[in-house]
């Protein structure tokens, strides 16, 4: 079965789509709550904490909108409308990348400035800060066509760092 046929079969099964949407919403909302808890733990000042909350809300909203652009493609979709939905999805994804990158950058700055956590935590949070800058540069430097390669690499490293920080938070009281 071709990948396009597999995606169409997935989208036609409304029960699976509904379950996937609920799982994604739950997981990413929990992640957002955890990011705010990390911000409190690293002592982000109130003004920056307010900015961080706004960025995380926008990041979540655009993430869910971006997911909906590929989960609910109808039978009447034409090539032109599919291309348009793809362009809108790319724009929404760019907003999500920018807001997420700024949120992680704020966390990084205050975690390193305040010396929060142990050395492993500081290294992981510093990597997140570097990845945030790389994601922004990947969007800004469109002529180099680096967005896909940088995005893929940073996506993997984001995941590893966030899992590492989560494990540290569960296993130690310092992180």
PLM ranges: what are they?
Residues 1-175:
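Hydrophobic, aromatic-enriched alpha-helical segments typical of multi-pass transmembrane helices
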